[in-house]
């Protein structure tokens, strides 16, 4: 079964907590602090598997969690790092943040990988906080929290050439003739319900991959038929072969078909509409009025499409010349990565030292992940801990920001449940 979209939940490992420990050995009166650091939590990493061709595996398992880091211990023992969790995805997978729909990564090469959830850093043990004036710190850092998010995976097939056109115009037949692909072929609409890939080999020319893109009809860019499901697969192609039924056996006008398909491309993606396009007037073996082809060709050329081939996939007439032109055109177009605009790109927030300050009456409230982490690390009833607490607030710019906001002596500063009076 071909599945090209999936939504999964990923969660990295939490960092291990630092240890609060003091050396206790016979004949050593003042052993000092010896609490070790916590281990780093495991990452969740998406890695490309060139042998995968579908996202089917993610319909059976949707939640993935990496291993947490181990806690530190006495004797300066460091916690064990959590193992990274590697999730295999097909080549050509786009990774999106499910909440914002922003693009996090484009995994389009065999060696590509992406850390989709970073493991938390291990907390420092109390031996890390010794100074000449603080020789017995009784606090340690907790491990950094894990990252968790829902992500969307979208598979965009990696093909050099895309076959587009209305249903039943002969795209699958053409694919089967020029490659070893064996798509389902029948005389009714939507015979092809998934994109099919084939490799075209031309003597003296490097091979290229061609894809039969099904389901593009009028209104496809707005979700009619199967269009939206498969239009994404055209995005990576460098050349489009627009297959037209020149015989009009189904009663449609070839030129009208040409205009409608191009209008759908334009509505879906303007850059896709501007991609090099070769017109393949198929089913010429059923065309009994040669003037009809010439009339169609003249109209199409007025739109700037000068490569119009009269072919018959059934009899292979003109097919070789069509493929040679596709190969020639490909040789002039460099392979480029999928363009991701700044508007669509996901930007990872720095969560370690984030905080915000707001004022309510004469109380200044400091909130954020930085505050939670700091309060978990210190004992506010211990004078040494309080001095360290004040130093961190000063170093991270909290005190300076409070003064810029106009704080005065005696005003209350609140961090979660802890309050203190501000003194200049």
Swiss-Prot record:
One of its GO terms (cellular component) is cytoplasm. Monomer. Residues 1-158 form the Obg domain. It is an enzyme of class 3 (hydrolase). Its EC number is 3.6.5.-. CDD domains: Obg (cd01898). Residues 345-424 form the OCT domain. It comes from Clostridium botulinum (strain Loch Maree / Type A3). This is GTPase Obg. Keywords: Cytoplasm, GTP-binding, Hydrolase, Magnesium, Metal-binding, Nucleotide-binding. Mg(2+) binds at residues 172, 192. Its cofactor is Mg(2+). An essential GTPase which binds GTP, GDP and possibly (p)ppGpp with moderate affinity, with high nucleotide exchange rates and a fairly low GTP hydrolysis rate. Plays a role in control of the cell cycle, stress response, ribosome biogenesis and in those bacteria that undergo differentiation, in morphogenesis control. PROSITE patterns: G_OBG, GTP1_OBG, OBG, OCT. It is found in: Cytoplasm. Residues 159-331 form the OBG-type G domain. Coiled coil: none annotated.
């Amino acid at each position: 079964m071909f599945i090209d979209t999936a939504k999964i939940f990923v969660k990295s490992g939490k960092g291990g907590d630092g240890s609060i420990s003091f050396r206790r050995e016979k004949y050593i009166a003042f052993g000092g602090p010896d609490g070790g650091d916590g281990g780093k939590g495991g990452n969740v990493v998406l890695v490309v598997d060139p042998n995968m061709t579908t996202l089917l595996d993610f319909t059976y398992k949707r939640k993935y969690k990496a291993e947490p880091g181990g806690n530190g211990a006495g004797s300066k023992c460091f916690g064990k790092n959590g193992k990274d969790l590697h999730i295999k995805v097909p080549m050509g997978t786009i990774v999106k943040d499910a909440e914002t729909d922003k693009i996090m990564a484009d995994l389009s090469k065999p060696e590509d990988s992406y850390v989709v959830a970073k493991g938390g850093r291990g907390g420092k043990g109390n031996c890390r906080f010794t100074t000449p004036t603080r020789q017995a710190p009784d606090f340690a850092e907790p491990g950094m929290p894990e990252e968790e998010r829902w992500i969307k995976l979208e598979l965009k097939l990696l093909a050099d050439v895309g076959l587009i056109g209305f249903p039943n115009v002969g795209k699958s037949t053409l694919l089967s003739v020029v490659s070893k692909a064996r798509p389902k072929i029948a005389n009714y609409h939507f015979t092809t319900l998934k994109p099919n890939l084939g490799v075209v080999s031309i003597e003296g020319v490097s091979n290229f991959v061609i894809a039969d893109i099904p389901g593009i009809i009028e209104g496809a860019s707005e979700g009619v038929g199967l269009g939206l499901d498969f239009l994404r697969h055209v995005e990576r192609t460098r050349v489009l072969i627009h297959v037209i039924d020149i015989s009009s056996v189904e009663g449609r006008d070839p030129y009208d078909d040409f205009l409608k398909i191009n209008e759908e491309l334009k509505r879906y993606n303007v850059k896709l509409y501007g991609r090099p396009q070769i017109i393949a007037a198929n089913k010429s073996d059923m065309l009994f009025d040669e003037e009809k082809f010439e009339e169609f060709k003249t109209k199409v050329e007025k739109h700037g499409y000068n490569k119009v081939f009269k072919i018959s996939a059934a009899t292979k007439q003109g097919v070789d010349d069509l493929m040679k032109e596709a190969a020639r055109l490909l040789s002039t177009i460099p392979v480029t990565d999928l363009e991701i605009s700044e508007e669509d790109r996901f930007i990872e927030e720095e969560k370690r030292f984030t905080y915000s300050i707001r004022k309510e009456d004469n109380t200044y409230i400091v909130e954020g992940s930085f505050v939670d982490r700091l309060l978990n690390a210190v004992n506010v009833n211990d004078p040494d801990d309080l001095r360290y607490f004040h130093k961190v607030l000063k170093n991270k710019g909290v005190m300076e920001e409070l003064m810029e906001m106009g704080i005065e002596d005696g005003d209350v500063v609140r961090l979660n449940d802890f309050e203190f009076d501000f003194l200049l």
